[in-house]
Curated annotation (Swiss-Prot):
Name assigned to this protein: Chaperonin GroEL
Family: Belongs to the chaperonin (HSP60) family.
Intracellular or extracellular location(s): Cytoplasm
Location (main, coarse): cytoplasm
HAMAP family: CH60 (MF_00600)
Source organism of the structure: Streptococcus pyogenes serotype M6 (strain ATCC BAA-946 / MGAS10394)
CDD domains documented for this protein: GroEL (cd03344)
Function: Together with its co-chaperonin GroES, plays an essential role in assisting protein folding. The GroEL-GroES system forms a nano-cage that allows encapsulation of the non-native substrate proteins and provides a physical environment optimized to promote and accelerate protein folding.
Assembly and binders: Forms a cylinder of 14 subunits composed of two heptameric rings stacked back-to-back. Interacts with the co-chaperonin GroES.
Annotated SUPFAM superfamilies: GroEL apical domain-like, GroEL equatorial domain-like, GroEL-intermediate domain like
Coiled-coil intervals, chain numbering: none
GO cellular component terms, semicolon-separated: cytoplasm
UniProt keyword annotations, A-Z: ATP-binding, Chaperone, Cytoplasm, Isomerase, Nucleotide-binding, Stress response
Database matches in InterPro entries: Chaperonin_Cpn60_CS, Cpn60/GroEL, Cpn60/GroEL/TCP-1, GroEL-like_apical_dom_sf, GROEL-like_equatorial_sf, TCP-1-like_intermed_sf
Length: 543
């Protein structure tokens, strides 16, 4: 395919147009008075959201060069979301600010490599300064406060706080759609382990790339499944029940995996295969945990069992299983309460006798998986559109809350980024490195400027007053008051803030150091088909 190539200023200008189109769409959502964006969907009602990464992923531009710029900013939002679960709009605003300030200087003759060095040095200093002012989060009220700020709902904050209290900060919390109008919290027995599907063709939801199995059977074995004939009798029995199947095995390869995938694609039956969690003896113990939780039996040579001889009675069962590319969650296994209690007692006794810190940690993980359960936040709303929007907000809030517990919190509303300006400004750099530092200094102001603008205030006035205010004091854009941000509950997880800055600086630096851009040439429009010989053009008028 032929290529279009742009160089130096033309290349950067085209990419920046794409950066601006995406960033200008996303940044209207920032802050307590941020607006919503309506996204057209191929099927069903449009999606109304203020979630930065969701908006960024939807944007595709017609011009290939502009689209590359937009996609780089979308990558910033996605990366920030993957690391911290929130802060995607802040990351987008920071990227746009660094790109614009940097481009001015590059156009004026500054060296992009020197600018990049200065940006990297200034960003590292800002991140260390953010970590230094972070305050730890502990206690139910503090956790609820973080969640409430992110979701813009005190009720959601309470649900997330209670869920984390009941299943632990690292416990499994899932978000589902409720059948009613009200949002509610439910804790059910469940287990999560860090193994995802072996093939992406096994997913049932192509948008979220997850496989949801309702009321499935579960085959548990420490053997490798390579020959489909070994499990064919069992598959035929499961097929008769019209229920899905989860296969947990040492591995599924050879002819077995493509055969399972092909039958899944054809709709013959719904099957998902995952690798068994853990290694060695620990793997055997975890498989036994899963078997007891689900009421199944581990097919293993240790018990003299062979796959080809396995019957339906060896299969475990559960109310629901969700599998993504990295993990599997089993909810409401069918194992007996007595067997599960005995297994928990056994693990507790092993905890008391072990002398190894590593073994103790792994035993505690297994105990949490068996005893902790899974918290389910069931989201209710009057309409499907409102339901989707609420789910996205709760997902963001949950991720932000976990990030806050992990690394602590700082003053929200962009205040923390203004606070660290003093540390960055103190860096003694020269030449283009100093220019890079100054670019970051200007970018650190941008989130506050945008939050104020979205709330109807003049950003520059707010920033000037903020720089001269006592530490911790900030601008509450929701009320227009100057308050102690942390005491008022306007807080951001430091992990979210520093991830947004790091990812923005990284991608913006790449754009500034770009000297050539290569894109596919648009395909020429196909010519209209020739009219058959002898046909009178006037004959077409009747259609």
């Amino acid at each position: 395919m032929a290529k279009d190539i742009k160089f130096s200023a033309d290349a950067r200008a085209a990419m920046v147009r794409g950066v601006d189109m995406l960033a200008d769409t996303v940044k209207v959502t920032l802050g307590p008075k941020g607006r919503n964006v309506v996204l057209e969907k191929a099927f069903g009602s449009p999606l109304i959201t203020n979630d930065g990464v969701t908006i960024a992923k939807e944007i595709e531009l017609e011009d290939h060069f502009e689209n590359m710029g937009a996609k780089l900013v979308s990558e910033v939002a996605s990366k920030t979301n993957d690391i911290a679960g929130d802060g995607t709009t802040t990351a987008t605003v920071l990227t746009q600010a660094i790109v614009h300030e940097g481009l001015k200087n590059v156009t004026a003759g500054a060296n992009p490599i020197g600018i990049r060095r200065g940006i990297e040095t200034a960003t590292a200093t800002a991140v260390e300064a953010l970590k230094a002012i972070a305050q730890p989060v502990s206690g139910k009220e503090a956790i609820a406060q973080v969640a409430a700020v992110s979701s813009r709902s005190e009720k959601v904050g309470e649900y997330i706080s209670e869920a984390m209290e009941r299943v632990g900060n690292d416990g499994v919390i899932t978000i589902e759609e409720s059948r009613g109008m009200e949002t509610e919290l439910e804790v059910v027995e469940g287990m999560q382990f860090d193994r995802g599907y072996l093939s992406q063709y096994m997913v049932t939801d192509n948008e979220k790339m997850v496989a949801d199995l309702e009321n499935p059977f579960i085959l548990i074995t420490d053997k490798k499944v390579s020959n489909i004939q070994d499990i064919l009798p069992l598959l035929e029995e499961v097929l008769k029940t019209n229920r899905p199947l989860l296969i947990i095995a040492d591995d599924v390869d050879g002819e077995a995996l493509p055969t399972l995938v092909l039958n899944k694609i054809r709709g013959t039956f719904n099957v998902v295969a995952v690798k068994a969690p853990g290694f060695g003896d620990r793997r055997k113990a975890m498989l036994e945990d899963i078997a007891i939780l689900t009421g199944g039996t581990v097919i293993t040579e240790d018990l003299g069992l062979e796959l080809k001889d396995a019957t339906m009675t060896a299969l475990g069962q559960a109310a629901k299983i969700t599998v993504d590319k990295d993990s599997t969650v089993i909810v409401e296994g069918s194992g007996s309460s007595e067997a599960i209690a005995n297994r928990i007692a056994l693990i507790k006794s092993q905890l008391e006798t072990t002398t190894s810190d590593f073994d103790r940690e792994k035993l505690q993980e297994r105990l949490a998986k068996l005893a902790g359960g899974v918290a389910v936040i069931k989201v209710g709303a009057p309409t499907e559109t409102a339901l989707k929007e609420m789910k996205l907000r709760i997902e963001d809030a949950l991720n932000a809350t976990r990030a806050a517990v992990e690394e602590g919190i700082v003053a929200g509303g962009g205040t923390a980024l203004i606070t660290v300006i003093e540390k960055v400004a103190a860096l003694e750099l020269e030449g283009d490195d100093a220019t890079g530092r100054n670019i970051v200094l200007r970018a650190l102001e941008e989130p506050v400027r945008q939050i104020a603008l979205n709330a109807g205030y003049e950003g520059s006035v707010v920033i000037d007053k903020l720089k001269n205010s006592p530490a911790g004091t900030g601008f509450n854009a929701a009320t227009g008051e100057w308050v102690d941000m942390i005491k008022t509950g306007i807080i951001d997880p430091v992990k979210v803030t520093r991830s947004a800055l790091q990812n923005a600086a990284s991608v913006a630096s790449l754009i500034l150091t770009t000297e050539a851009v290569v894109a596919n040439k648009p395909e020429p429009a196909a010519p209209a088909p020739a009219m058959p010989a002898g046909m009178d053009p006037g004959m077409m008028g009747g259609f």
